[in-house]
């Protein structure tokens, strides 16, 4: 395969994954057809199987890559001179109006979690792996000794729940209250600096 063809194939594969991620957020896995994914990527349906073995293969990879990219991007935005400050900057970014309203590039979890639970394997394993990886990285950032992992898990649950509820009632006062409550509870969850 020539370099040009290899690059074109790589670009097509990326476009398919971007389209699938957008559909995952908007409709979920079950309601997203291969035809819809390919249409969103600006490609013909016939080319799909040059890139992925099945719809399941595509969405498993989207869950892995999309979750990883989202979490890694969030962790890279961490700012502050202390572990607490960096962790709070992550929670504030995640629970921001901008992130809530960014349906096409935000976190995959609110749109995917319930469906992944119903769909079972291999989706569940893919998501579990990515969540575990984020928890490990977040726990290292929190740096709260023996409680680091527990706090990272608690914060992830809090962040996801607040964002999910906020998105469900977006455009209302209650939506903003969910984000604010998530931020306040995050502050309480993290160890105070000495």
Please place each PLM-identified region on the residue numbering:
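N-terminal intrinsically disordered/low-complexity leader segments
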Residues: 1-9, 192-194
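N-terminal positioning helix adjacent to the helix-turn-helix/winged-helix DNA-binding module
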Residues: 5, 12-19
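Helix-turn-helix
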Residues: 15, 23-57, 61
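Hydrophobic alpha-helical connector segments
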Residues: 61, 75-106, 144, 155
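Short, basic, alpha-helical segments at the C-terminal edge of helix-turn-helix-like DNA-binding modules
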Residues: 64-70
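Amphipathic alpha-helical segments used for helix-helix packing
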Residues: 86-89, 100-128
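Hydrophobic/aromatic-rich alpha-helical bundle segments in the mid-to-C-terminal region
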Residues: 120-129, 141-194
